[in-house]
């Protein structure tokens, strides 16, 4: 069974194919959790006669993506993908890079390719294969702690096939809105410090008043739910 994409990824994939055909470069900037990797996997599936070089920040990330692919499309086999981490690429020799011979290069979390050493490895690969089509996937194009560098501009010449903000993904129902839960835990040490300060108060009237406040605070804290209760109440789906 072929890889099936959700509508937001289908439209992004169509834009990717058109942009790759026109410019050879395409970036997709979608929030985490929207299934960006499936856009890359669909490109691999539709290009089985081509060699895909897939670069990822870590083995764990790529392994998790493959597990998600297997869950949704168990019959899909992508033997045309050569996978490397950015760190592995950084240390590859020219001969090893020459053995890759990619028709397509996928840069997952492409903003990471702006790092000094990882970026050098990516540039070495791109220089070796200037005609390979380049697809980038990331939740952001900006390296905020690196002079606000825009990696979509640097790597893809500004060719962004699809861009979606976190707010848009929530409004469109692609992602669930966040749920914030405020609670107090591990307060015993702080409470003991307040008790000690109250006991050392010389003025009896002030001390008596403070002790009343402390007792009221203690009763309130005793009624507070523990972390186990909070997790069970608000984290109903832990699969």
Segments the model singles out, each with a brief description of its role:
Residues 1-27:
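Conserved pre-motif I regulatory segment
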Residues 16, 39-47, 121:
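Hydrophobic residues on the short alpha-helix immediately C-terminal to a glycine-rich phosphate/catalytic loop
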Residues 58, 85-88, 137-141:
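A short beta-strand-to-loop transition that corresponds to the Sensor-1 phosphate-sensing loop
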Residues 146-238:
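Interdomain helical connector at the RecA1-RecA2 junction of SF1/SF2 helicase-like NTPases
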């Amino acid at each position: 069974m072929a890889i099936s994409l959700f509508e937001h990824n289908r439209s992004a994939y169509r834009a990717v194919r058109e942009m790759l055909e026109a410019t050879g470069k395409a970036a997709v900037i979608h929030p985490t959790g929207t299934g960006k990797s499936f856009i890359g996997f669909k490109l691999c599936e539709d290009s089985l006669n081509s060699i895909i070089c897939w670069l990822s920040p870590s083995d764990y990330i790529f392994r998790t993506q493959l597990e998600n692919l297997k869950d949704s499309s168990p019959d899909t086999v992508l033997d045309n993908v050569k996978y490397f981490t950015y760190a592995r690429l950084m240390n590859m020799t020219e001969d090893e890079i020459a053995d890759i011979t990619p028709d397509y290069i996928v840069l997952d979390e492409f903003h990471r390719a702006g790092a000094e050493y990882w970026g050098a490895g990516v540039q070495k690969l791109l220089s070796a294969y200037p005609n390979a089509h380049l697809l980038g996937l990331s939740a952001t194009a900006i390296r905020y702690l690196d002079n606000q560098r825009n990696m979509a501009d640097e790597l893809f010449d500004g060719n962004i096939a699809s861009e979606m903000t976190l707010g848009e993904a929530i409004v469109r129902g692609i992602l669930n809105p966040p749920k914030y839960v405020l609670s107090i835990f591990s307060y015993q040490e702080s409470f003991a410090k307040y008790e000690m300060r109250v006991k050392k108060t010389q003025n009896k009237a002030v001390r008596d008043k403070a002790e009343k406040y402390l007792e009221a605070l203690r009763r309130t804290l005793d009624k507070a739910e523990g972390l186990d209760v909070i997790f069970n109440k608000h984290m109903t789906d832990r699969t």
